[in-house]
């Protein structure tokens, strides 16, 4: 009689093996589709990692300033203000205060704001002024040294947001249910056109606006403004803003959607078009020169029982989501299921955005965890180097400002960044038959630390507790590796092997195999190029 032990020993001694390839997930993750029919270039999860040449861990964050803006509060506004020839300030709002950084400490701009109100901050470069608005208080203007309330005849009493357009300053005023008006001239202190004279009331309420044009400019024939409404999205445009519209030539076009946006911090210009998070928890892209928003967030909308995506954003927290276009990605930060702070990010690779054969857009990467971001700000003006700044969303941590994605920073303020990739479920030839795991080979940059490796079938983990020790042959810094022996060339690419069967410590049988590779370090990150799995086919069907 042949026992199961005899069968396993026979497997150990078998010579017939098959090699299965696992490429890096260039198509990103897919939480929406059938887990069995995912593309080999898709992944179930890419936590804290993304594809750029190889699959690499994200960089970490450091505090911009060790002192809180306001003790034990969250950040509710952040902006980089450029003015004059080469002047710049970081403007921040927390609790009741608007403050700026002097270069060594936080200093007050205004201390009488309504506590905790999300603030939209905009620069009008032509006047060297920045405008801070929250929809409750009079808007505050700041020129780098002195502050004042927004003023003028018919001035908005409770501005939600301002936006320079053509030679005017547009404003959404909460006093009139979020309707729009604008300055009557090239000034913010003179006369303002009345809302009734402007006649721009496309929705029951407007929440925010951004420029919508391929060159991200408020001038030019194609320059338009995307308005976020309660019940839809709208495009405002015109070269002559004299009122009424029969005198000027401005107009409002409603887009082909009944879904609005109440999360103005998620509205972003990208080279592909304007993006935003809708009130239905879907991410939309409005390509330039079209009137039809495309839903592009399906792949981060989970239909799997063990993973969550944007579908679990609490209804009361949609308005607090935020996003930024940075380093080729649309980076979306939001609160997870049952949470009140933004703890999760997903990144859409705009440089490689594509619709797949199922009609879904990607590549998306994430979840990115370990950072609690309430609002982002790019530092991409004169004298800056494209730094990505962020405000703290969790008041129990404190009102800190961080620099994210910092070169050479491999931790989040000293906390290791947990990176892992879980691949698609490879059918290993015939998914009706079982295979025995024999050996795994990884092609990667040989930095330092330890990789944890697990093998999963669709019903759970089959083999866990495996480790691969990296040799420290390459030192990572930013986007560059240096070998230990020669700091002038890239670090070494290595092949690392893990034996499971055939003398490697046991045999595991499965029908489909998803690799889960994890890494965590405060001094390094990983960069993986390919994985190959050697299995021994069995003549064992399902039972």
What are these regions (language model features)?
Residues 2-128, 258-274, 278-543:
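Beta-sheet repeat architectures centered on beta-propellers
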Residues 139, 154-161, 423, 427:
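Proline-rich low-complexity regions
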Residues 62-75, 110-118, 147-280, 284-320, ...:
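Beta-propeller and closely related beta-pinwheel folds
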Residues 95, 103, 133-135, 144, ...:
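Short strand-coil-strand connectors
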Residues 92, 121, 141-142, 227, ...:
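Short beta-strand element of the conserved SAM-dependent methyltransferase core
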Residues 120-150:
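Hydrophobic or amphipathic alpha-helical targeting/insertion segments
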């Amino acid at each position: 009689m042949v026992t199961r032990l005899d069968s396993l020993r026979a497997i150990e001694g078998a010579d017939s093996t098959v090699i299965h390839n696992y490429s890096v997930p260039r198509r990103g993750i897919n939480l929406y589709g059938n887990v069995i029919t995912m593309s080999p270039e898709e992944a179930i999860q890419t936590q804290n990692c993304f594809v750029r040449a190889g699959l690499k861990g994200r960089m970490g964050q450091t505090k911009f300033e060790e002192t809180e803006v306001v003790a034990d509060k969250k950040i509710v506004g952040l902006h980089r203000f450029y003015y004059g020839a080469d002047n710049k300030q970081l403007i921040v709002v927390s609790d009741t205060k608007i403050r700026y950084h002097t270069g060594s400490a936080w200093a007050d701009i205004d201390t009488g704001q309504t506590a905790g109100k999300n603030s939209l901050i905009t620069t009008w470069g032509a006047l060297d002024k920045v405008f801070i608005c929250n929809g409750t208080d009079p808007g505050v203007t700041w020129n780098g040294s002195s502050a004042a309330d927004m003023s003028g005849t018919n001035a908005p009493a409770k501005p939600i947001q301002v936006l320079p357009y053509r030679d005017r300053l547009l404003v959404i005023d909460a006093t009139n249910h979020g309707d729009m008006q604008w300055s009557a001239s090239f000034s913010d202190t003179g006369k303002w056109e009345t809302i009734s004279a402007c006649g721009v009331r496309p929705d029951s309420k407007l929440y925010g606006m951004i420029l919508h044009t391929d060159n991200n400019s408020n001038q030019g024939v194609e320059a338009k403004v995307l308005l976020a409404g309660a019940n839809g999205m709208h495009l405002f445009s015109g070269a002559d803003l004299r009122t009424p519209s029969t005198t000027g030539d401005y107009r409002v076009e409603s887009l082909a959607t009944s879904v609005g946006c109440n999360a103005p911090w998620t509205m972003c210009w990208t080279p592909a078009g304007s993006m935003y998070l809708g009130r239905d928890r879907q991410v939309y892209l409005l390509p330039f020169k079209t009137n039809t928003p495309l839903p592009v967030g399906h792949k981060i909308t989970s239909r799997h029982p063990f993973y969550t995506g944007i579908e679990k954003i609490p209804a009361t927290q949609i308005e607090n989501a935020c996003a930024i276009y940075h380093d080729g990605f649309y980076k979306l930060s939001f609160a997870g299921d049952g949470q009140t702070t933004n703890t999760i990010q997903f990144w859409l690779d705009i440089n490689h955005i594509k619709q797949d054969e199922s009609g879904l857009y990607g590549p998306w990467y994430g979840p990115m965890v370990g950072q609690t971001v309430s609002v982002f700000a790019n530092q991409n003006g004169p004298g800056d180097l494209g730094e990505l700044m962020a405000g703290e969303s969790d008041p129990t941590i404190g009102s800190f400002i961080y620099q994210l994605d910092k070169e050479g920073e491999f931790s989040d303020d000293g906390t290791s960044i947990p990176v892992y990739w879980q691949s698609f479920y490879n059918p290993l030839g015939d998914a009706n038959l079982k295979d025995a795991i024999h050996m795994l080979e990884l092609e990667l940059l040989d930095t330092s630390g330890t990789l944890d490796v697990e093998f999963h079938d669709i019903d759970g983990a089959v083999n866990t507790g495996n480790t691969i020790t990296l040799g420290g042959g390459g030192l990572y810094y930013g986007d560059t590796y240096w070998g230990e022996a020669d700091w002038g060339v890239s670090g070494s690419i290595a092949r690392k092997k893990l034996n499971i069967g055939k003398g490697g410590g046991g045999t595991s049988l499965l029908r489909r195999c998803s690799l889960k590779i994890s890494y965590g370090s405060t001094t390094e990150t990983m960069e993986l190029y390919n994985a190959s799995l050697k299995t021994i086919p069995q003549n064992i069907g399902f039972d």
